[in-house]
Design a protein with these regions (language model features):
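Conserved hydrolase catalytic core segment
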Residues: 110-149
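Short beta-strand/loop motif that positions the catalytic acidic residue
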Residues: 229, 235-237
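Catalytic active-site module of serine/aspartate enzymes centered on a nucleophile-bearing elbow/loop
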Residues: 259-297
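Conserved acidic catalytic loop of the alpha/beta-hydrolase fold
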Residues: 90, 94-112
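Acidic catalytic loop of the alpha/beta-hydrolase fold
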Residues: 240-244
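Hydrophobic, aromatic-rich cap/lid helix
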Residues: 198-222
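Conserved HGGG/HGGXW glycine-rich cap/lid loop of the alpha/beta-hydrolase fold
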Residues: 9-83
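Helix-rich cap/lid subdomain of alpha/beta-hydrolase
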Residues: 144-198
Length: 297
């Protein structure tokens, strides 16, 4: 684990693998700490010949919390967006993309292969739009170029009231993970419970999640901007994602010229171990392709 100043804030990060290998920057999603990229997943990715960087986004985990910016009403922001009204955010996805670039700067990387999941995929999209020179490839996992309404009962997972007790918070995390899973892979409740408990013990900061949600909504529709992206791109999406619906994956792939779209049958909004071979093969193949294309003749 390490900590650096990037874009004027503090970011907590961890690196796996050999610094001589191609660098992958993993960007995680809404309210999710870097530990949502499991250690075993990162080690397997590093074992395939990559240097892997995971980190806590601003306002979550052990990175800088932005409480001085005030509380956010994420449901009001969603309502405004659905009504076509402007949304005022404490910070933006562009700011979060700048955080990622600042982390690369702090660690001495001119560019990296960018991998983002969910909101992390949205940040990754914003990064390759705003900072194309810093990206060698883009992998977008269960993400979307714009806000596409999902089932309100599924979205409500992110606005459940705080149970107020440790066990209540753990159970809510388990229930939320079950609701957003796709049903095509085994749901290991004991494993999920241990993971949720460890994350709560590491950091509990729902106020940051609310501000991140408003940042998502405020960024609007990136579709037209993505048409200018000229990078090797892979889009991975579960066929049964109830939160970021499959349409989001299709629209991402359609917006980026030459993007490859891989559907993972039965996967929801999750990274189940049973899907890792497909995900790891996809990322590794894309990185190898990009490295070959960028090698001197």
């Amino acid at each position: 684990m390490g900590r650096v100043t990037a874009n004027g804030i503090e970011l907590e990060y961890e690196v796996f693998g050999d610094e001589a290998d191609p660098t992958l920057l993993l960007i995680m999603g809404l309210g999710a700490q870097m530990t949502t990229w499991p250690v075993e997943f990162c080690r397997e990715l590093a074992g395939r010949g990559h240097q892997v960087i995971r980190f806590d986004n601003r306002d979550i985990g052990l990175s800088s919390h932005m409480d001085h910016l005030g509380e956010a009403d994420s449901m009001a922001a969603l309502g405004a967006a659905m009504a076509g009204e402007a949304v005022d955010a404490a910070y933006t996805l562009a700011d979060m993309a700048d955080d990622s670039v600042g982390l690369l700067d702090a660690l001495g990387h001119d560019a990296a292969h960018i991998v983002g999941a969910s909101m992390g995929g949205m940040i990754a999209q914003r990064l390759v739009i705003n900072h194309p020179e810093r990206a060698l490839s883009l992998t977008s996992i269960f993400s979307t170029p714009r806000f596409i309404p999902a089932d309100p009962e599924v979205v409500a997972v992110f606005n459940w009231p705080d149970p107020g007790t440790l066990e209540g918070r753990i159970q809510a995390g388990v229930d939320g993970a079950r609701i957003t899973s796709g049903g095509g892979f085994p749901f290991d409740e004991d494993l999920v419970r241990r993971y949720v408990a460890a994350n709560i013990d590491r950091s509990w900061h729902p106020e940051g999640q609310a501000r991140q949600m408003v940042a998502i909504v405020a960024d609007g529709d990136r579709t037209e901007e993505l048409r200018s992206v000229d990078l090797p791109t892979l889009v991975l999406h579960g066929t049964h994602d109830p939160l970021v619906v499959p349409q989001g994956g299709q629209e991402t792939a359609d917006a980026i010229v030459g993007a490859e779209l891989v559907w993972i049958d039965g996967m929801g909004h999750e990274l189940p171990p049973g899907a890792w071979p497909t995900i790891l093969d996809g990322i590794s193949g894309l990185v190898a392709e990009a490295e070959r294309a960028g090698a001197p003749a």
